[in-house]
Amino acid sequence: EKLSEFNAKVPNAYQSQGDKMGFLTIDGGTLIALDGQHRLLALKEVIDNPTEGDYSADVRNDEVSVIFLNHESSTKTRSIFNTVNKYAKPTSAGDNIITSEEDGYAILTRRLIEVDDGVLAESVVNWKNNTLTDKSTHFTTIKIVYETVKLMLKGSKVPEYDFEPTTRPRAEDLDHAYNYVSEIWQLMMTEVKPYNFVLENGSDFSEKVQEARSPESNNSLLFKPAAQEAFVKGVLAACQPQTDDDEPELTIQEAFKRSNKIRWSMSDDIWQNVIIKSSGAIDGGAEGKNRMSLLISWMLLGNKMSDDKKLKVRKAFNEAHGIDIEQNPNKEKSLPEAIK
């Protein structure tokens, strides 16, 4: 029923749109959700069944915007359904981490940033974007926290921590895994000196993190998201046994402490072509991060690294500089000196 058909005085502001506004009365027929089926099912489940949550009883009173389409033919309805779903904007990686209740890595990532129990304050993590500009006032991104959680748990070699992203882990396994990753994160933030101010989260945090990330900073790499992921991967690799029968040469705490001796400036020659492109930008791809992590593990271990792992580092480092050491052994570039 159009608003213009009512025998009531309509304000002048609405009169010109009277044919486009009105009331919809549905009498009979069948309602089919062309889009939002999961949301509809979730609302129905909360309304029909007792649900935990302070506001579950109020859901039945919520107002939801809906677009109604008249079914003219199966062909037209099917076409609309296909178009809506085919061109739907996919959720971002950050959104998936924020909302997933099945992915154990995502659940633990959020716990690391909780107000009461977390290691990181919400304000120091960018929840929306996967990258940080030099002017960003965040320390890292939720995507990088997620990736480090995966690295830590997979590196633990504990079978119960090898989560299937589509199946929610047992509460007990989540608790144990959280204790494990939160301890490593706490060690990183306390033992890696450039990170100490992040936990303090003082009133001057924004200025400090921008200064630390600037290309001129002595520690600029440690504040670039891709390099942060590579850093954690490299430290964890250095803490793995060098052979099947060996004990690790370093504990995670020792590795973080030793990392303070590494030169972390983006302008330092050791990172050129490894994770820093010729343009000066970060190479955030998988190969760049892998090269950086290998080089970090070498600098932390030095000659304590097994020969086969050192060969892998030598190959990756030289390939970054356009040298194939198997075909041109005489052109091999020496690895940067390991820390002492």
Residue spans of the language-model regions?
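Accessory terminal alpha-helical modules
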Residues: E1-K340
